[in-house]
Amino acid sequence: MTIFGKTIPNPIGVAAGFDKDAEVYNSLFKLGFGFVEVGTITPIKQYGNSKPRVFRLEEDEALINRLGFNNLGSEITSFRIQNNKPNGLLGINIGPNKDTKDRIEDYLVCLRKFHN
């Protein structure tokens, strides 16, 4: 199967939120996932929303996620990826910092940091 000009072994991947800080993506490839997405990554480190931030709706059999993009920031994440080359198709989910004054610039900062 080919996606974005890259061959992947299968269409089953791991979405952003599982490996928020790009710590285990190569292990996920070894488990057999066809692609992995890390993040969400913001320009600078942030801790996310205060707890509680995950809520269970038993009647609806659902969860509400209000984690708030807790992550180590683009500098550390970029360093990790550069020093631990992905063994598969790696996506990077980017987002703005919670208290930013310019959300568009936050996206551009991350895009410039990771696009290579």
Language-model features: where?
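N-terminal amphipathic alpha-helix/helix-capping segment at the start of soluble metabolic enzymes
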Residues: 1-14, 76-86
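Active-site cofactor/substrate anionic-group-binding motifs, chiefly glycine-
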Residues: 8, 13, 24-44
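Hydrophobic faces of well-ordered beta-strands that scaffold small-molecule active sites
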Residues: 12-16, 34-38, 65, 77, ...
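Active-site beta-loop-alpha junctions enriched in small/polar residues
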Residues: 17-19, 41, 95-99
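Short alpha-helical segments and helix-capping/turn motifs at coil-helix boundaries
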Residues: 19-28, 76
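Acidic (Asp/Glu)-rich catalytic clusters
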Residues: 29-30, 80-87, 112-116
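A gly/proline- and charged-residue-enriched helix-loop-helix capping module
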Residues: 39-89
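Alpha/beta enzyme core
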Residues: 101-116
